[in-house]
Amino acid sequence: MIVVGAGLAGLNCALTLQDRGLSVTVLEAGDAVGGRVRTDVIDGYRCDRGFQLLNPSYPAVRRYVDLPALDLRSFAAGVAVAGDAGTTVVGDPRRQPGLIGRSLLSGFARPLELTRLAAWAAPALGPVSRLLDGPDMTLKESLDEAGVDGRIRREILEPFLAGVLASDDGSTSAKFVRLLVRSFLLGTPAVPADGMAALPEQLAGRLREPVRLGETVTAIESGPKVRTTAGEEPARAVVVATDPTTAGAVVRVRAPRMKGLRTYWFAADDAPRTDNLLVVDGRRDGPVVNTAVMTTAAPSYAPAGRQLIQATTLYPTEATESEVRIQLTRMYGRSAGAWEVVVRHDIAEALPDQLPPLEARQPVDLGDGLYVAGDHRDTASIQGALVSGRRAANTVAAALAG
């Protein structure tokens, strides 16, 4: 078996095939495993390639990942909303009951608005099968239909979701957003102490045959047969588990539109906040969709005595670094002018677009011994990537046994 691509989908596919007693070779064009889940270590700072979080409530994560070994560092179950009158903290009342009164009195979540928001989100806590049944619509249409409006929508929900979805136009599938809301309600997002790259590295470490790095696939032919920069590889089956654009170029699969994010990683002597909350801008008067002091949750992300702050915008963007610093200064109430840029990541293809109607289980068998896996075949998430990899592997195994 040959798996092309050592992202989460490819690695979980290879592990599933291996568990079924099959010999697997994983080819990866890059210099490390992970695909879009990578971490750059620069002068002692751990900068994930784009701000990413791991939600331990994902069923596939609980099933396939050794979570204790990742030494997860959790963010708080809430969000800090920067506004003209300062910053207001709005938390999950089930896990941070002390914030209930503050949330209600803040003006962001009046009782009627809370009731409407709860009614809109209610399907997220029911069976997933029921959540996925029925017609779909855009996020904007679903919020309008549910009467979710006011400051809770404009200053919290929409700014928060813009960073999660890599989109602020409300066009994302409402079903997909509710799936994400479900994961947020059931778990607290975190990062591994060694960076997000620790997740794919853990999966790759279980493979009996090491991933072959630096091998670019140039063609996939009937047989099936894979041509790479190192030569020709015959196989009983080939699973293409690359990014969607690459997959669309080498096999017969339609590549979805991809959405981008830009993340600045800043180093500072002092933390502008001492809690481990994600911060959004309720005023929405700048390019930053979210920011966080990574080292308040994960001190290992920076050298001792130093702080690491991420700031994320949509991409592409014409916003300058100066505009980002000005907005961060307003959001934190402390000057960001002297912060040092460790690195800036422009992720042009951060997430596949998830337009309605949501297609959560797209075909993985392309015929002639060719298969495809990736979050673009399931849902645009770590959960979707892991599930897709296993689904493709099971399909391969069934075909070989049949």
Region spans (language model):
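Glycine-rich FAD pyrophosphate-binding loop
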Residues: 18-42
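Mobile amphipathic helical/loop "lid" adjacent to a hydrophobic cofactor/ligand pocket
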Residues: 61-62, 66, 70-170, 185-186
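Helical element adjacent to the flavin cofactor pocket in flavoenzyme catalytic cores
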Residues: 178-229, 233-234
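Short beta-strand to alpha-helix junction loop
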Residues: 52-59, 131-137, 146, 182-204
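Mid-domain catalytic core of redox enzymes
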Residues: 218-322, 331
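Conserved flavin/dinucleotide-binding core of flavoenzymes
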Residues: 294, 299-402
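Glycine-rich active-site loop/strand segments that organize a redox cofactor
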Residues: 38-57, 118-132
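N-terminal Rossmann-like FAD-binding beta1-loop-alpha1 element of flavoenzymes
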Residues: 1-26
